[in-house]
Structure formats: structure tokens, C-alpha cells
């Protein structure tokens, strides 16, 4: 589990750092797991983001598979940060990423 713990520590650091500098949206690249079916880091990151959202520490997040113009959260993120419209993973259903709205 040390790899997962290390990944979560890095995530917390990056979210805090970017929030302090005024960034509103950040894309986390956590991968999807070496077999394409596992992904302990992906699962842990998304579980922690759900807890952070429930605690009011982040506004919202959208998983890569749902990072699409058809997603209400994605549309809200685009209003908050128009630059996201040019993100290469938009509409690609990439399960190796998660977009976080700080």
C-alpha cells in the first residue's frame, strides 16, 4: 500500500498548492492500472475525492470516463475554467484521469 499512500500525499500537496495559487481546475493523471482492470491508485484517488467533496474541501470532480460535454459537472467546470475546453482528454473517456474543480 505504500505506493497508494505516496500517491495520495502527492495529490493532497498538488491540490493545496494549486488552490493557494488561484487555480480552479486541475487534472489528475493517476493511470488506470497495469492490467487495465485494477488501478489501486485510481480507486483510492476517486474515493478520497468523493470524501473531500462531501466535506466541502473541493467543489466537485469528474472521472475521465465521464469527462464529456454531456456531463453536467463537466459543463460547470467549463464555465469555471474555459481553458478546459481545449483539454485533449475531453470526450476521450480516459479512465486514467480525473478532473478536479477546486
PLM feature segments, named:
Residues 1-102:
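Long, charged, low-complexity intrinsically disordered regions
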